[in-house]
Amino acid sequence: YALPYARETPFLKRLPLVGKVLEWRMVIKICEAVTRFRKFVGWLAVINGVGVTVYTGLLLQSFPAVALWANPGVPLLFTVSAFSTAMAFLLLIMYTVIKDAEDTRIRLLYERIDLVLISAELVILFSFFFYLKRGSESAMRSWELLFTDFGWLIGFIGFGLIVPFFLELRGVVKGWTSHVPIITASVLVLMGGYLLRHYFMYAGIYAYPW
């Protein structure tokens, strides 16, 4: 879906290998087809994107022997995190590659959406804190692994959620004179998205027997 826009982006055209690939006859034909059936391809991309977003959490939830994963909040947390990292990636691209002055309103909208998504993640994690601490043996062991690990507390919750939250909040309320704070926030959100998935896999404790 984004291929026609990529062919119009000066930055990508200037890249040695990418610029040549974008001028291939096959790529041009694909761009023409995508432009012609733009609405259909767009909806197809939306369906595929939502499917990829949701399925990871649903897959983890299907393991009943792991209390950390067998939780209705897991698909919700992973879905919110996926949309948040998507917003962060778009902001990163718009501030570093595209740099179109006409996109100011869109960038501000993405910042507001990401702010809401980060807030939702923090609320969900707050509920996970009590669910795991007061849950089964498997849940309590997962709690110990997560909430005593500085990588989770400082890396994910601190730098992956709280710091970007305040950077984007300041940008939405008062604005920034430089793009650096929002770029920093976007990079931190992407890092936090990885750490969430890493620690969720790491802290899944199997309850035996099941």
Positions of predicted regions on the chain:
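Long, contiguous internal "core" modules enriched in hydrophobic/ aromatic residues
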Residues: 3-179
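Juxtamembrane boundary at the C-terminal end of a transmembrane helix
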Residues: 194-210
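Aromatic-anchored segments of alpha-helical transmembrane domains
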Residues: 53, 123-124, 189-196
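Central hydrophobic cores of alpha-helical transmembrane segments
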Residues: 182-190
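C-terminal halves and exits of single transmembrane alpha-helices
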Residues: 1-3, 200
